[in-house]
Amino acid sequence: MKIPIILTLMLFSLGFIFGFISINNLSKINDKDLSNYIPNIQFNFPSILTNNLKVIFLMLAGSITFGLSTFINLIFNGFNVGVLIGSISLTNEPLKLITALILPHGIFEISAMLISAVAGFKIPYKVTLYLLDKKEKPLTEEDIKDFLKLSLISIILIVIAAFIEVYITPKIATYLLT
């Protein structure tokens, strides 16, 4: 289990660093050009939950794409978080803005994303061990149970994150920023 965790943290961090660094180049694009690339996501519970569940299921799909979908989406989402944090740092807004707008739901959302990525890498990792003759069976009942537990935990966390993002984060932000 250690290798999937390390791989997950390294790829997310790599994406984050590239996103954070590249925000200086992205900030040179004028708002009109940038508006074509910003997705139109409505700010309500079903929309936020659906969008976040897509990310979780793409991470989990790594179990059947031999880690490819997890790999791509982990770097992409790390990049997005890096761009978000980098763009906030460019605005010279106080740290409490970052805390108010990201931290309440971000703790659950990023945890869910990372846990689902570990799950998405777990099965390909176990199959690889089998192919390298380091395991007797490609998948054991325990491997499948672990995958399902991680999947369920990530889904529960993403539901909590969406709820907090829609119903609690705005109230915390309003309180801290007034």
UniProtKB/Swiss-Prot annotation:
It is a multi-pass membrane protein. To M.jannaschii MJ0706 and Synechocystis PCC 6803 slr1478. It is found in: Cell membrane. Pfam families: SpoIIM. This is Uncharacterized protein MJ0793. The chain crosses the membrane at residues 3-23, 56-76, 101-121, 150-170. InterPro entries: SpoIIM-like. Keywords: Cell membrane, Membrane, Transmembrane, Transmembrane helix. Its main location: membrane. GO terms for cellular component: plasma membrane.
